[in-house]
Amino acid sequence: NKKIYFVFYSKKRKIQVRAEGIATIHKDNEITKQAWTKTQMMSRKCYLSTQAPGDLINESASDLSKDMGGSLPSLEQSEMGYKNFCVVESKIKSFEWLYLASQGHRRAKFILDENKSTWLVP
């Protein structure tokens, strides 16, 4: 399934935007290589985990090597994290706008490829 959704909310403006699109996952290609070269060492350190995010563990831990401690990895060490790195490219196809108001909400949908918009029941 290549669908992707983004949801944004502004408490101040009382507006929610939900965008729907198609995602392409890039792994070990020119796009990821170019993006990886722009990352900082503190960001690369996050990709050095030996387990996947959300895996169950027995105790609270960061899953980073104990010898890493609070230090940043060397350039050579950081390259080991590239295998866990990807770029998610997304093309937004449509989005919905929702305005929350005590006198009645308002909702609209915009379909970008068709240059169409319509009102929806909130």
Region annotations inferred by a language model:
Residues 15-122:
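Charged, gly/pro-rich active-site loop segments
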Residues 1-14, 22:
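A short mixed-secondary-structure module that forms the rim of ligand-binding clefts
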